């Protein structure tokens, strides 16, 4: 009922609504309405009240609370259960904990801030308070564990499509799952799982999307290599962006569950920024160059070195443009 009352005020666009009208339209007592409004006030919403006119909503907090997320969702299950945290070390770690305790599929863990955000190969990821979307989605798929690695590509497709829907049409995927915009990193994705030989217990998909950081607010180490919606001139609604991403993820997941991953791999190729490019493959102290020509049925990158086609497995390597400097050691 609280969500319905909040949605009712949103649709009023700042106009006063009498308690009698709300009571009549939502079939709830005026006392209950008053109690719900007081709870909303405690959660950061600001209402103006008038003896003759009733109430009007004049401020909603720019936070990814369950109420805010729910108001924007268009999914069946993804995001319908939200674990909300003001700050955490890692949403992935929180998600693993509740997944082990039986959290249902589609549950998301959302934090306003991550103090220990990380990506592939244990790289750090900058996650300041309310300047991005830091979340993890819990899945309990029915396909075999050998297929689990393809969820990384599925996640990249869903996130990239959601980002394109909110204005950054040129966003694309750097193999396997970074989302770039005009060569700069916009999103990091980290997929982890728990499984036996026969069955997947859970898969978690963690994503960090830069939304509200100015270029000057990025740490110097990332200033030239990272970007955000705001740095690209778009003041995006975080709840609308998260809702779009969850909707696209749910679509891709449904395809993977019912049709297999062939369509998902096609979707990934259509969004790829890596295929057709000259790349450097870095494997510990070793590195070689070649052209990224395709991905195989398992999502591995195929790199033509001129002498042979190498099969590159995600998680073992770093892929960089051929003219990029080697990482410092």
Feature-to-residue mapping (PLM):
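A short, compositionally biased micro-patch
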Residues: 50, 128, 174, 295-296
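N-terminal lobe of the biotin/lipoate ligase/transferase fold
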Residues: 2-165, 329
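Short loop/edge segments at beta-strand edges and connector loops
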Residues: 86, 173-175
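Long, positively charged amphipathic alpha-helical accessory segments at protein N-termini or as interdomain linkers
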Residues: 1-28, 38, 42-43, 147, ...
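Structural motif
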Residues: 81-82, 106-108, 133, 172, ...
